Amino acid sequence: MSLVTSLTYVLPHRLLSSLARALAYSKSPATKQWLIDTVTRKFGVDLSEAQEPDPRVYPTFNAFFTRALKPGARVPDADPQALLMPADGRISQLGPIENGRIFQAKGQSFTAAELLGDESAAVPFHNGLFATVYLSPKDYHRVHMPWSGTLRETVHVPGRLFSVGPDAVRNVPRLFARNERLVCHFDTDFGPMASVMVGALLVSGVETVWSGVEIPRYGDRITRKDYRGKGITLERFAEMARFNYGSTVIVLLPPGVAALEGGLAAESSVRLGQALARRQVA
């Protein structure tokens, strides 16, 4: 375990993330430009695909970080039966949900019920599939729909704000089931689908297209929002949310719906819109 990961056990997660939020939304020209230049240089951010490639134009660091891409920079897989990768990034893990458990790293796993904050909500995903995608600071930070769906419910699960970098994933037990997260439940033509937006150290917020800022929230109680009857339907490949710094999205699918795309594995670099899985059509 690295020193940084060890320190995250004792660091004041909330305070640091609050400070990160204040800096991310600062309109001080000197502050925001220093942040943009530092992150661009340190992580090798490529602005050639950005709708606005000039880093000086962004009013805040957060505006830079959640930047839009040029039209056509990402396109969905041409196969209409392909479920899509929800984001640019790197696959942390993917595979079957065996006995209700989701694999995190060697010797590490957690239950779908822990992740979703609800035992009954996890049942439809037992023996289904999951994919965990890590968005690094250099990546495009908007998350899109793998498949068309109608929003049924969101569940805010309070928790810690550990780093979600590779070292933390290997060494912090049940990491994604411990961090603060927003669970988004959708109804699709094949049944339920869940997209879980996981918060992390220095993540200044998670926003959804239907409700705005969802994280951070304060308190230690799970909170739910019922969207049934609201008619919030998002099409395959449509934007659903964005991270205001790097973090992780986990997609859960029920059994018998799709087969994972060949060639995908842990550590694979992926791009929004490429095939994650393909429908199993009888």
UniProtKB/Swiss-Prot annotation:
Enzyme class, spelled out: lyase
- Tell me, what is one Gene Ontology molecular-function annotation carried by this entry? phosphatidylserine decarboxylase activity
Subcellular localization, per the record?
A: Cell membrane
Question: Which residues are annotated as modified residue Pyruvic acid (Ser) in the UniProt record?
Answer: 247
What does the UniProt PTM comment say about this protein?
Is synthesized initially as an inactive proenzyme. Formation of the active enzyme involves a self-maturation process in which the active site pyruvoyl group is generated from an internal serine residue via an autocatalytic post-translational modification. Two non-identical subunits are generated from the proenzyme in this reaction, and the pyruvate is formed at the N-terminus of the alpha chain, which is derived from the carboxyl end of the proenzyme.
Q: How is the cofactor bound?
A: Binds 1 pyruvoyl group covalently per subunit.
Q: Where is the active site?
A: 88 (charge relay system), 144 (charge relay system), 247 (charge relay system), 247 (schiff-base intermediate with substrate)
Pathway terms, separated by semicolons: Phospholipid metabolism; phosphatidylethanolamine biosynthesis; phosphatidylethanolamine from CDP-diacylglycerol: step 2/2
Please indicate which residues carry the site annotation Cleavage (non-hydrolytic).
Answer: 246-247
Q: Pfam families recorded for this chain? A: PS_Dcarbxylase
The record's keywords, sorted A to Z, are: Cell membrane, Decarboxylase, Lipid biosynthesis, Lipid metabolism, Lyase, Membrane, Phospholipid biosynthesis, Phospholipid metabolism, Pyruvate, Zymogen
Cofactor names: pyruvate
Q: Which reaction does it catalyse?
A: a 1,2-diacyl-sn-glycero-3-phospho-L-serine + H(+) = a 1,2-diacyl-sn-glycero-3-phosphoethanolamine + CO2
The way this protein sits in the membrane is described as:
Peripheral membrane protein
Q: Which Gene Ontology cellular component terms are annotated?
A: plasma membrane
EC number(s) reported in the record: 4.1.1.65
Q: What is its main location?
A: membrane
Question: Which Gene Ontology terms describe the biological processes this protein takes part in?
Answer: phosphatidylethanolamine biosynthetic process
The record's subunit annotation is:
Heterodimer of a large membrane-associated beta subunit and a small pyruvoyl-containing alpha subunit.
What HAMAP family does the record tag this protein with?
A: PS_decarb_PSD_B_type1
As for family, the record states: Belongs to the phosphatidylserine decarboxylase family. PSD-B subfamily. Prokaryotic type I sub-subfamily.
Per its database record, what is this protein's job?
A: Catalyzes the formation of phosphatidylethanolamine (PtdEtn) from phosphatidylserine (PtdSer).
Q: What is this protein called?
A: Phosphatidylserine decarboxylase proenzyme
Identify the species of origin: Xanthomonas campestris pv. campestris (strain ATCC 33913 / DSM 3586 / NCPPB 528 / LMG 568 / P 25)
